[in-house]
């Protein structure tokens, strides 16, 4: 084999340049040389070879390979060039500087050596260096094709839409002639290495052309391998499913068609996959029925539909479209709980007492016939006492009253046990028929929305507790306790506002965090402080082990209520059916498949979230580009060493870079604030501020503001001790040239809205900021 021949030659000769090695192995010709280079590259990534500074090649010595222990994990890149090593959920990430990344790409499995251990007292992460790439994650890329004759052997290149990939991707000359207007998807054939700082790829598909309607969003989705089209065999299976249940389908099901069953969704929703019924029982308890479309009855394990659902993991929702997990024939047809038609469901029938506790329940396969298709807006009108809505739906007015009463009971119960209510604001981007954003507004959530969410939570908990008590292999939705270091940072920061949180980072109750949230409610910057607390939490994920749900303060939790759009819910439905008679064979089967499905579902969920964020940032930046040069009022959302982010009231967010400020500013890590060296002017989280928009880049999603002096400005006296320490720091840093703005910028969590002084419409966010400023004065 070539690998052994290379090693034998280098053992005999010590070291060699690539050309001499190729000649010695008779591989200098055009036919064999590329294969040699590919093998050398792979051996280097496996730490079998090393390049010297003079470009010569040699075997790594055993003592070099074994000198330091390595750690394996997944590399997570930042677009600024640095990154982090993620080992597992129980380990803190390690920081990898841009000079230590090597040729690792976001998502690669890598081996690192630890350069500097973590310092828990200082709260600093361990620092590491990539020494080997075990597995490449990037298999495809998407971008605009650029004609280029810089490298004659290639047709041109693309720049990936993924900003974490810095290098050009050169395209092999293909039978299809590319003109330079195409958005193409390519398969990666060769990765960057020393002396070869670019990718080589082959064209897989032409996604579209510049100027096509919606091509910007499609490019983002394709770059993340989120594909709308279903394979032919998947569509064939979906089309073969009957449009209505047959008598055979109803055998063994609990018949609930006589119940007054209601769906409550958005006005434009088509996949109505959940419905409820409610009764007040003679003993004063409530009967709540949560009915979910029985998707698993139609999507059988191992089928083409099932395999495609596993591959997708979840539906993806971006500004102007949905990429569904399952074909619309299912989601909008047989599995949509449309009014006055029989539908197969799985139901959680719960008896709930006045304290919000489930005292009796049944989880069953059922058949229902929904009575009303309601919208959130109409139900909110009924709750608010709108006479027209109450008259139109008089027959279910009492049901709605019962729903509200039960919702409040459940809400109180969860609050008492310590559930954290992170009711953060979300943006709704309104686009025209060409996909161009025309407005950005706050997404409204009324009692009806929270009420349905409350009932879904109850069903999810009930199902999870049922299977945990039965000690059957199961998939849980878990949210582990926050890591002490992150929580301590937040506790320290909250103390700078004069807010003391009872307990320590190692032992703090949800009740203490609830008290904090109640204390800051209504105060300037409360939304930002709640978001900072949320960011100190761990990410929820799927697991075969039950660790409870910290945020909900729930001992048991799963996802049961959305099998149309989440694979774990589909899996739970399948287990509800199969565990009716839980044989050992079924136990063993699910115990074997659940861990991998839990991991993949968690990863695919995060991919979907990333796609949604990228598209949102892009569309917000596109919207704001029209208003460059205009002034806006907002609040300081976060402060970092290189500046601070400003958020407008409708969630638009942009960066004020420290280099754009009129004097030298010092960063206080404890208070997360910046203070002017001469003026004493302070920028800290929550304070109002006036800014001017100077940049809105649709391609990167970045929005940049410039600070403007205003009545909002805060000045604090500079302490003498601070002056002395600052002088010392300035002296020690004089030898350096400073920090480049481009290298310091991180991903701006774009949140955008806004009209201008020139616009005919009075700005929502300016109105809000003015109202707040009047209150403060």
What annotation goes with each model-predicted range?
Residues 218-220, 304-309, 446, 491-493, ...:
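Short secondary-structure boundary/capping segments
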Residues 79, 134-137, 149, 207, ...:
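A generic structural motif
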Residues 363, 376-648, 662, 666, ...:
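Append "with occasional cross-activation on large, charged helical scaffolds in nucleic-acid assemblies
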């Amino acid at each position: 084999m070539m690998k052994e021949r290379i090693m034998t030659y280098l053992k005999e000769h010590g070291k060699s340049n690539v050309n001499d090695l190729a000649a010695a192995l008779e591989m200098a010709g055009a036919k064999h040389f590329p294969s040699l280079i590919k093998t050398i590259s792979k051996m280097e990534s496996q730490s079998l070879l090393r390049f010297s500074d003079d470009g010569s090649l040699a075997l790594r010595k055993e003592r070099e390979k074994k000198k330091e222990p390595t750690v394996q994990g997944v590399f997570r890149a930042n677009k600024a060039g640095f990154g982090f090593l993620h080992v597992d959920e129980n380990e803190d990430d390690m920081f990898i500087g841009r000079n230590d990344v090597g040729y690792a790409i976001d998502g690669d499995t890598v081996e690192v050596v630890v350069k500097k251990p973590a310092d828990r007292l200082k709260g600093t992460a361990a620092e590491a260096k990539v020494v080997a790439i075990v597995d490449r994650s990037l298999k495809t890329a998407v971008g605009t094709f650029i004609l280029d004759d810089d490298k004659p052997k290639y047709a041109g290149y693309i720049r990936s839409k993924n900003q974490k990939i810095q290098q050009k991707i050169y395209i092999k000359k293909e039978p299809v002639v590319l003109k330079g207007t195409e958005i193409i998807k390519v398969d990666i054939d060769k990765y960057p290495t020393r002396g070869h700082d670019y990718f080589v790829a082959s064209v897989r598909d032409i996604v579209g052309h510049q100027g096509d309607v919606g091509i910007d969003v499609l490019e983002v989705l394709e770059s993340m391998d989120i594909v709308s089209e279903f394979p032919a065999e998947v569509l064939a299976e979906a089309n073969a499913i009957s449009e209505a249940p047959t008598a055979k389908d109803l055998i063994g099901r609990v018949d609930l068609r006589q119940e007054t069953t209601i769906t409550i969704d958005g006005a434009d929703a088509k996949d109505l996959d959940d419905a409820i019924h409610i009764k007040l029982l003679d003993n004063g308890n409530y009967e709540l029925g949560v009915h979910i479309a029985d998707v698993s009855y139609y999507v059988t394990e191992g089928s083409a539909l099932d395999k495609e659902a596993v591959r997708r993991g979840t539906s993806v929702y971006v500004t102007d479209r949905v990429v569904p997990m399952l074909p619309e024939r299912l989601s909008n047809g047989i599995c949509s709980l449309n009014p006055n038609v029989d539908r197969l469901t799985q139901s959680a029938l719960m008896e709930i007492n006045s304290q919000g506790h489930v005292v009796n329940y049944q989880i069953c396969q059922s058949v229902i016939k929904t009575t009303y298709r309601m919208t959130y807006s109409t139900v909110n009108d009924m709750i608010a006492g709108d006479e027209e809505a109450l008259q139109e739906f008089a027959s279910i007015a009492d049901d709605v009253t019962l729903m509200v009463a039960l919702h409040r009971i459940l809400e109180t119960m969860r609050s008492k046990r310590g559930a954290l209510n992170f009711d953060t604001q979300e943006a709704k981007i309104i686009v025209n028929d060409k996909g161009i954003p025309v407005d950005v507004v706050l997404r409204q959530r009324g009692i009806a929305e929270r009420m349905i969410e409350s009932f879904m939570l109850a069903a999810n908990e009930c199902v999870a507790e049922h299977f945990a008590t039965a000690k059957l292999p199961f998939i849980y939705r878990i949210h582990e306790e926050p890591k002490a270091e992150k929580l301590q940072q937040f506790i320290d920061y909250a103390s700078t506002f004069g807010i003391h949180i009872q307990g320590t980072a190692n032992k703090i109750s949800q009740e203490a965090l609830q008290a904090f949230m109640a204390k800051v409610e209504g105060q300037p910057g409360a939304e930002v402080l709640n978001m900072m607390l949320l960011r100190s939490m761990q990410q929820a994920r799927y697991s075969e082990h039950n660790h409870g749900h910290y945020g909900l303060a729930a001992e048991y939790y799963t996802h049961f209520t959305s099998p149309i759009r989440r694979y774990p819910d589909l899996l739970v439905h399948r287990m509800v059916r199969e565990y009716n008679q839980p044989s050992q064979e079924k136990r063993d089967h699910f115990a074997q498949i659940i861990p991998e499905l839990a991991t993949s579902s968690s990863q695919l969920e995060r991919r979907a979230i990333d796609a949604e964020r990228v598209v949102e940032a892009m569309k917000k930046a596109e919207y704001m580009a029209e208003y460059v040069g205009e002034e806006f009022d907002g609040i300081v959302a976060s402060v970092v060493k290189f500046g601070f982010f400003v958020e407008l009231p409708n969630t638009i967010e942009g960066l004020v870079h420290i280099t754009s400020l009129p004097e030298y500013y010092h960063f206080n890590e404890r208070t997360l604030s910046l203070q002017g060296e001469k003026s004493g002017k302070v920028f800290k989280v929550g304070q109002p501020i006036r800014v001017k928009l100077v940049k809105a880049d649709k391609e990167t999603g970045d929005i940049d503001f410039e600070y403007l002096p205003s009545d909002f400005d805060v000045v604090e006296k500079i302490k003498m001790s601070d002056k002395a320490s600052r002088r010392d720091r300035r002296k020690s840093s004089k030898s350096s040239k400073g920090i480049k703005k481009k290298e310091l910028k991180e991903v701006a969590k774009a949140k955008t809205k806004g009209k201008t002084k020139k616009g005919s419409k009075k700005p929502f966010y300016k109105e809000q900021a003015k109202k707040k400023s009047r209150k403060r004065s």
